[in-house]
Amino acid sequence: MKEHFNNKSLKSLKIAYVGDSNNISNSFALAVKVLDLNIFFCCPDEYNKSLKKINKDFKKLKISNNIMKSTKDVDVIYTDVWTSMGMEKENRKRLKAFKNFQISKDIINNANKKVIFMHCLPAHIGEEVTEEVLNSENSIIYKQAENKLYTAMALIDYILSS
C-alpha cells in the first residue's frame, strides 16, 4: 500500500477489508491497534466472531455487514477467500452467507475514484471477486504477490545471517 500511494502515511488511507474473519482480518485488526489504521471490516454477522473478540477490549474496530457502507469512498479494498483451507466442508454454507459480499465493479465504483484492489491469492473468481475486478486497472494483486517474494527472501536472509 505504501509503495502504491507513494509512501503516503497509512493512517491517512481508508481501507475496507471485506470477507471472512480469519488470519488476514485478524492481522489487520492488530494493525489498527498498533498503527492506528482506518479500516472498515465487512462480513456477515455470523462470521465476525474473532473480530468482535479482539474489539471487546480494544473498541476501535469498525465492523459492519453492509458492503456499500464499508466501501464508500475507501482508498483500498482488500478481500480473501470465503472458505479457508481446512473449512472445505463449510463451503456451500459460506457461499450462501457471503454471496452479497463479492467485490464487483459496483463495489469498486462505490469507492474512491483511484481505489486499489488487493487479494492475498489464490482468488476464487466468481466468488469473493469478479474476473473484471481481478484483472482491472484497480487491481494490484500481481505487485502484491511479487512483494511477498521479496519479504520472504528478506526474512530467510535475516534468519540465516543471525
Regions found by a protein language model. Name each.
Residues 1-162:
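Structural/interface elements that position substrates and couple domains in central-metabolism enzymes
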